[in-house]
Amino acid sequence: MVDQLTQHDPRRIGPFEVLGRLGAGGMGLVYLARSASGRRVAIKTVRTELAEDQLFRVRFTREVEAARAVSGFYTAAVVDADPRAAVPWLATAYVPAPSLEEIVNECGPMPAQAVRWLAAGVAEALQSIHGAGLVHRDLKPSNVLVVEDGPRVIDFGIASGVSNTRLTMTNVAVGTPAYMSPEQAKDSRSVTGASDVFSLGSMLVFAATGHPPFHGANPVETVFMLLREGPDLEGLPDELRPLIESCMQMEATGRPNPADLQAQLAPHLFGSGSDDSGTASAWLPERAVGLIEGRRNGRPAVKPATTAGGRGHGHGPSGARAPVHAPPLPPPPAHDPVVPAPPAHVPAVPAPVGAPDGGPVRLPGAAVPIGPGPRVADMRAAAVAAPPPESALAASWSRPRPGVNGADPAVPAPAPAPPEASPAGWRPWRFRMSNDVWGTPRVAEDLVYVTSFEVHALDVATGRRRFKTRDVAWSMAVADGRIHASDGPTLFALDAREGADLWRVQTDAWVYSLQADRGTVLTATRGGGVQAWEASAGQKLWEVTGAQTDFESPEAGAALHDGTAYVWQDARLRALDARTGDERWSYPIGDAASCGGVPVRLTQAPDGYVYVAAGTRVLALEVASGHVRWHFEAPAVFLAPPTFVPGPAVTGGGVYLADYLGTVYALDATDGRDRWRIATEARSSTDPVLVAAGHVHVGSGKGLYTLDAVTGTPKWRFQAGGDIVGAPAVAEGRIHFGSSDHLLYTLKADDGRLRWKLATGGEITGSPVVRDGIVYACSKDRCVYALDAEKGTGTARTT
């Protein structure tokens, strides 16, 4: 898919004319371009901050030289490069073909012989790459294009040079958790070609089954599965197990090299003597061959029809499995609803498609604003043209058993609080980014902040973009009228209202965690560093080294709460003064192994205690002294921090959390007593349980479970069409959450009845946010959505 160029994109790179955007990666943007002779190439550019690093330039120059030596048939050849340009770039041959990810998502798992054919081609490509002194380090389905005569491996040009490990950068993230090797997850600086062989095995699992071998709810959980549980090989044909299991040996020395793999595969592929045994048509299903031919001829890919239990949109870009046991969702309309044409001077407005308790709420194509919406005065004139909303339940929904998906709850619930209306004159909008959107939106005053490589500030009222940062932001926090962000090695702050630069400093390593509170910015950097900065001017307040390096993710970084910084260092949890770095106390929490191989997660509560989840343990430590109030032990590890609710246990007060296997615990905050525990039917994620209005809400697998906070009695359960993503949001008697089935759901919090749902073009990312009657959500379709929390995409309401 090629996107249009923005006003900030170059029109020429070196001798090439730039035609469009192909995408973006961790190191920069990728463009489609054309040479003077008409040859099309893919050009990968390098981010500005990396280009300013002289050590990176040396590494990049040497790897370009090595990449030129890769000449295998199954790789996309390097055409040209300029590592000394102001913005370094690398051009490779453009291959108009679908990726392996697209083929499997749209056509289903491959037959066993097709998997062998794919494996042989990729193994030969790896032999060429390794022979040039490179390790790919990010071999995955989206980096393998499939053409008629075999696969083509791409994105090896900025791999890690194995001939000079001194040049390996510690502040450049390379690799995808679902497909990386164990040694890469532990230390990405010391991998060898055997790491690519493990990734090949993981990729073959996806090709043969339709799901990756490791598929946690987030990168931390995925790495946990990789290192502790082993691959999920459900659905893998027995005849492929010896091949794939040999590639996925935990010890690198036990894996075959690419030449061994080719020798192992040759008898299966070429023993028949068939002339066409090396082509896609000999092995792939007819539909997949048609997809390849269509892409080669410039035709767009045809999306598969969606069935009730099918694969139509059950596979997102991550390759997650389609739902198997979920109840069927009502099918979307065969076409977008027809919106009456407004007068020439009146812009079109979105029609309300689906009302409360109806089918999926859909934003009709041309009638939905991409970016800023029309003026309120125009909305009043156009509102009369909108068709009335449907009020009946979708026909394909059958009445579920009590307590499930909106049937009568097992226990009567109290009446919800009266709903809060959206601001007068406001109407729903969506804004489409030019790049992927990730994470949870932040709302402050009249702006919503979203990360899409840069930080984008959108006007709450209209959806217009107020500004965006000029730098990439991998980490972001909004506090005290400032945006604090990091592009990796640089920490910077901007005015949250206007986007003006306030300050920027260079850090010694890649920032993977960032928090801001009470005038202090706390960062955690790769290699075990933790730093505190003055939020207003950027001066470094203090720094410690030797912090844990087993889990370098935003969830596992140093924590900042009410003037206290919590650092996991030398097997101890240390409480430091956030302004001075002075140690107040420390507790022997243990190392990663003694904590069950999972990060330590904590919550500081207003009762003067910090509640800590460390593996299978939960502890209550006094904030002032570190004194242990109580200790609780569970049979399974906890991935999420505890949730504290003030008040006595008889009114629902206490500490709530769910373990990795999905069991929900209610602990007495005064003594740690296990008041009740309820086992759900699927594993939990790293998101904390949500407690509101006497209810405990927890997303576990495809189910959203609601329990009575006092007794643990199940109130209701809602079954979504895919795994629940992020933490639900509760406000004004409604609960909002996203799912991997591309839907944003809104339920009545008291009984679980479906209020409305929005069908997006991708998986919901992060968690929805509700503010002043508006729910904000981001999707992998590159859109930010702002919807009426009560009605979804209802008509505009004005005073």
Curated annotation (Swiss-Prot):
It comes from the Bacteria. The modification Phosphoserine is found at S71. The modification Phosphothreonine is found at T168. Changing T168D: Almost completely abolishes autophosphorylation. No enhancement of kinase activity on AfsR. Constitutive kinase activity. ATP binds at L22, G23, A24, G25, G26, M27, G28, L29, V30, K44. Keywords: ATP-binding, Kinase, Nucleotide-binding, Phosphoprotein, Serine/threonine-protein kinase, Transferase. Autophosphorylated mainly on threonine residues. Some phosphorylation on serine residues. Autophosphorylation on Thr-168 is the major site enhancing kinase activity towards AfsR, and is regulated though interaction with KbpA. Residues 325-343, 411-421 have a biased composition (Pro residues). It catalyses: L-seryl-[protein] + ATP = O-phospho-L-seryl-[protein] + ADP + H(+); L-threonyl-[protein] + ATP = O-phospho-L-threonyl-[protein] + ADP + H(+). One of its GO terms (molecular function) is protein serine kinase activity. Pfam families: Pkinase, PQQ_2. InterPro entries: Kinase-like_dom_sf (IPR011009), PQQ_b-propeller_rpt (IPR018391), PQQ_rpt_dom (IPR002372), Prot_kinase_dom (IPR000719), Protein_kinase_ATP_BS (IPR017441), Quinoprotein_ADH-like_sf (IPR011047), Ser/Thr_kinase_AS (IPR008271), WD40/YVTN_repeat-like_dom_sf (IPR015943). The keyword Transport does not apply. Residues 295-343, 393-426 are annotated as: Disordered. Residues 16-271 form the Protein kinase domain. The active site is at D138. Its EC number is 2.7.11.1. Gene3D superfamilies: 2.40.10.480, 2.40.128.630, Phosphorylase Kinase, domain 1, Transferase(Phosphotransferase) domain 1, YVTN repeat-like/Quinoprotein amine dehydrogenase. The keyword ATP-binding applies. Interacts (via the N-terminal kinase domain) with KbpA; the interaction prevents autophosphorylation of AfsK. Belongs to the protein kinase superfamily. Ser/Thr protein kinase family. Involved in the regulation of secondary metabolism by phosphorylating, on both Ser and Thr, the AfsR global regulatory protein involved in the control of secondary metabolism. This is Serine/threonine-protein kinase AfsK. The lineage of its organism: Bacteria, Bacillati, Actinomycetota, Actinomycetes, Kitasatosporales.
